[in-house]
Amino acid sequence: MVLSQRQRDELNRAIADYLRSNGYEEAYSVFKKEAELDVNEELDKKYAGLLEKKWTSVIRLQKKVMELESKLNEAKEEFTSGGPLGQKRDPKEWIPRPPEKYALSGHRSPVTRVIFHPVFSVMVSASEDATIKVWDYETGDFERTLKGHTDSVQDISFDHTGKLLASCSADMTIKLWDFQGFECIRTMHGHDHNVSSVAIMPNGDHIVSASRDKTIKMWEVQTGYCVKTFTGHREWVRMVRPNQDGTLIASCSNDQTVRVWVVATKECKAELREHEHVVECISWAPESSYSTISEATGSETKKSGKPGPFLLSGSRDKTIKMWDISTGMCLMTLVGHDNWVRGVLFHSGGKFILSCADDKTLRVWDFKNKRCMKTLNAHEHFVTSLDFHKTAPYVVTGSVDQTVKVWECR
């Protein structure tokens, strides 16, 4: 690299200043003579400490360059994988991106369930500390605590209007809350053990619950009476979820099976057995996902012309399975989590599956290609629950680390 005469002169004066100010008198006088520097007080002041300044700023710049290079590489990666910088992606393909928008603390024990409100910009979390907390997911503000259960709250569910919230607990009860006045309006007794799951039926008239007593019960919202009991599981029933029109309910259990029941007749329509450990979670496929599922699995459209219904299940065997309920067949198995799978659901766009697990991650799966396309190290401890907002670009997760995290999708 060639320096101009002026640059060379400046460098020489800076070196001379460095030698003199650090007491290298002999070297200074020899250097001054050889570099033919005339002594000029004014000029010398200008170059005082210049060499050290240049030296440290070069190191600072190097660090900055390295930071920018790594950011550029990240952006390139996002671009090639169709990230936010690529062609403007369809909201149907938005996925959660790190870091989280908010990490919300307040619970004093592990968080067991997180759900979004169907109408307002709030979400609700349940915890082993026996409370339910309400948060604003847009601002990250804590709003209130609902108290009433005397043991771990295991699951929560809104009706479609968001005016009613159901909760269930290890205290063996199910509670119904008026979500406008935040009062408990009804408590239902009837299970003989920990109630692990609850869901309000799509019509809003009934609630279903699942328990460690091996049964599933259906309750009337108006009266709080138990109107049906579904029996068949041989162990603890972990989760129960109705399909979109409320004609079927799916359940999963420690007996390693997933069952699908016809609500009207209480008959077990399907018993799905391929998991090799406790099945922790289930989720129905929305109709928006049917075309991608059919493409991915080549599943034939039935004579009725309507595919499905399809169901997802997540297990302690670390896998996620997709089932065709009409045939009882397992259509695919997604492998990638390193620990128990605790939550699974379809992306509202219908092309992806989201899951969370005890390996502390939140994962996004491109199920058409049966691959995990994004892994987020979501929490410091097991991730117990997740929910995906139906219309706003947010995902929420809850964890044994006692926090609730809000993730923005783009």
Swiss-Prot record:
Going by the entry's taxonomy, the superkingdom of the source organism is recorded as Eukaryota
| Keywords tagged on the record | Cell cycle, Cell division, Coiled coil, Cytoplasm, Cytoskeleton, Developmental protein, Differentiation, Microtubule, Mitosis, Neurogenesis, Repeat, Transport, WD repeat
Q: Which SMART domains does this UniProt record tie to the protein?
A: LisH (SM00667), WD40 (SM00320)
Choose one Gene Ontology CC annotation of this protein and give it: centrosome
What sections of the sequence does the record tag as coiled-coil?
56-82
Biological process terms in GO annotation: acrosome assembly; actin cytoskeleton organization; adult locomotory behavior; ameboidal-type cell migration; auditory receptor cell development; brain morphogenesis; cell division; chemical synaptic transmission
Indicate whether Cell membrane appears among the record's keywords.
no
Per its record, what are the GO molecular function terms? dynein complex binding; identical protein binding; microtubule plus-end binding; phosphoprotein binding; protein heterodimerization activity
* Repeat region (WD), residues: 106-147, 148-187, 190-229, 232-271, 274-333, 336-377, 378-410
Query: Which subcellular locations apply to this protein?
Result: Cytoplasm, Cytoskeleton; Cytoplasm, Cytoskeleton, Microtubule organizing center, Centrosome
Q: Which PROSITE patterns match?
A: LISH, WD_REPEATS_1, WD_REPEATS_2, WD_REPEATS_REGION
Subunit comment: Can self-associate. Component of the cytosolic PAF-AH (I) heterotetrameric enzyme, which is composed of PAFAH1B1 (beta), PAFAH1B2 (alpha2) and PAFAH1B3 (alpha1) subunits. The catalytic activity of the enzyme resides in the alpha1 (PAFAH1B3) and alpha2 (PAFAH1B2) subunits, whereas the beta subunit (PAFAH1B1) has regulatory activity. Trimer formation is not essential for the catalytic activity. Interacts with dynein, dynactin, NDE1 and NDEL1.
Write out the similarity annotation.
Belongs to the WD repeat LIS1/nudF family.
Which purpose does this protein serve, as stated in its record?
Regulatory subunit (beta subunit) of the cytosolic type I platelet-activating factor (PAF) acetylhydrolase (PAF-AH (I)), an enzyme that catalyzes the hydrolyze of the acetyl group at the sn-2 position of PAF and its analogs and participates in PAF inactivation. Regulates the PAF-AH (I) activity in a catalytic dimer composition-dependent manner. Positively regulates the activity of the minus-end directed microtubule motor protein dynein. May enhance dynein-mediated microtubule sliding by targeting dynein to the microtubule plus end.
Q: Which comment does the entry carry about domains?
A: Dimerization mediated by the LisH domain may be required to activate dynein.
The protein's name: Lissencephaly-1 homolog
What lineage does the source organism belong to? Eukaryota, Metazoa, Chordata, Craniata, Vertebrata
